[in-house]
């Protein structure tokens, strides 16, 4: 395969993903195939987002890292010192992806580090490793292309998380603003009583203690439930089981108390 064919192989994987999130494991496997090296896609904190192995490394520590999908903290921190592609680092480099405790076995091990950058910030690191054969310009072009794609994907995921966060918050704020003053008061007492995200509640007890009617409590719970903020289930004489579904709810409720 020449460089163009290899690039097309990466493109084909991206085109197949069409609109769907790019799978980091698939990305690693494609790069592993075209570059013929072990490939590790790491997040900023050293979480292994995807990997593919070309040459098996028989080493317990490495096996555990792959099983736990986590690279050591110290190693991950040091990667931030590398700000541009660093090819063909040998076994004596602190950045080697080979186990240093087996130096003699991997004395011809070469590692290439490619920073993953997107939106002007460091998002992770792409690590390539193989034995004997040096990484050449063609390999580095493919690796940097792969790192760019991974960077864009991480940014897209981040944007989705921010969007989801904003949506959750808006739903909660709308649900709370739909409550009347007495319903809001009832809800505050209910969640003080629950002291957590789920539990059992006896509506009549709260109604008596706070001095409101039971129907106010029922209405308040119904409004929150129809907004998808909580779920509730009647357990007859035992009371009502309540569970918070939207993790922004208790935070927003807490804010209201301090206003």
UniProtKB/Swiss-Prot annotation:
Residues 1-155 are annotated as: GAF domain. It is found in: Cytoplasm. Pfam families: CodY, HTH_CodY. Keywords: Cytoplasm, DNA-binding, Phosphoprotein, Repressor, Transcription, Transcription regulation. One of its GO terms (molecular function) is DNA-binding transcription factor activity. The modification Phosphoserine is found at residue 215. The keyword Oxidoreductase does not apply. GO terms for biological process: negative regulation of DNA-templated transcription. It comes from the Bacteria. One of its GO terms (cellular component) is cytoplasm. Residues 203-222 bind DNA. DNA-binding global transcriptional regulator which is involved in the adaptive response to starvation and acts by directly or indirectly controlling the expression of numerous genes in response to nutrient availability. During rapid exponential growth, CodY is highly active and represses genes whose products allow adaptation to nutrient depletion. PANTHER family: GLOBAL TRANSCRIPTIONAL REGULATOR CODY, GTP-SENSING TRANSCRIPTIONAL PLEIOTROPIC REPRESSOR CODY. Belongs to the CodY family. This is Global transcriptional regulator CodY. It comes from Anoxybacillus flavithermus (strain DSM 21510 / WK1). The gene is codY.
């Amino acid at each position: 395969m020449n460089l163009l064919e290899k690039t097309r192989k990466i493109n084909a994987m991206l085109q197949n993903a069409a609109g769907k999130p790019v799978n980091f494991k698939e990305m690693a496997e494609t790069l592993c195939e075209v570059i013929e090296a072990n490939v590790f896609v790491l997040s900023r904190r050293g979480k292994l987002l995807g990997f593919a192995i070309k040459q098996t490394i028989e080493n317990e520590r490495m096996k555990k890292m792959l099983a736990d999908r986590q690279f050591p903290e110290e190693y991950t921190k040091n990667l931030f010192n590398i700000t541009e592609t660093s090819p063909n680092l040998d076994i004596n480099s602190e950045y080697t992806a080979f186990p240093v405790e087996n130096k003699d076995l991997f004395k011809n091990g070469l590692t290439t580090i490619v920073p993953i950058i997107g939106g002007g910030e460091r998002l992770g690191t792409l690590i390539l490793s193989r034995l004997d054969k040096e990484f050449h310009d063609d390999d580095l072009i493919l690796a940097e292309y792969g790192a760019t794609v991974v960077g864009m994907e991480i940014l897209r995921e981040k944007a989705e998380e921010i969007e989801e966060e904003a949506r959750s918050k808006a739903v909660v704020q709308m649900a709370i603003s739909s409550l009347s003053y007495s319903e809001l008061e009832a809800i505050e007492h209910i969640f003080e009583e629950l002291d957590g995200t789920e539990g059992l509640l006896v509506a009549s007890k709260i109604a008596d203690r706070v001095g409101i009617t039971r129907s106010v409590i029922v209405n308040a719970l119904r409004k929150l439930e129809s907004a998808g903020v909580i779920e509730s289930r009647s357990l007859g004489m035992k009371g009502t089981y309540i569970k918070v579904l939207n993790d922004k709810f208790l935070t927003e409720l807490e804010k209201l108390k301090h206003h």
